[in-house]
Amino acid sequence: MAQDFSQHPQTGIIRRHRFYSPKPLSTTPRGQSFLLSRQAKVATWDPMLSPDFQPKSAFKLTWTAQPPCLSVTPSQGQTFHPNSPEGELPPDLTENTCPSQA
């Protein structure tokens, strides 16, 4: 048994998490609503605040949702790189890219 546990430490962690979350949900309805509202707040408000909440996917979501212009610029974006002497995009590029996207 000990060898099995050391070989698969993740399964033990997953089982623990599954055990801990349903218990308060089924025992106390108050805990359920609190947990749900808490999860919703974390998911919609700022997933970056809780590091356990899959920061990679959360970052992707906010990154693609917020700047529509930015997602277009990297294709032409040699000017956008901080290494460039200008540092910022030329006004022409920004004006052409953003309104056509929106």
Curated annotation (Swiss-Prot):
Domain of life per record: Eukaryota
Region (Disordered): 1-30, 70-102
Chain intervals with Polar residues compositional bias: 1-10, 72-82
Name the record gives this protein: Putative uncharacterized protein encoded by RBM12B-AS1
Organism: Homo sapiens
Taxonomic lineage: Eukaryota, Metazoa, Chordata, Craniata, Vertebrata
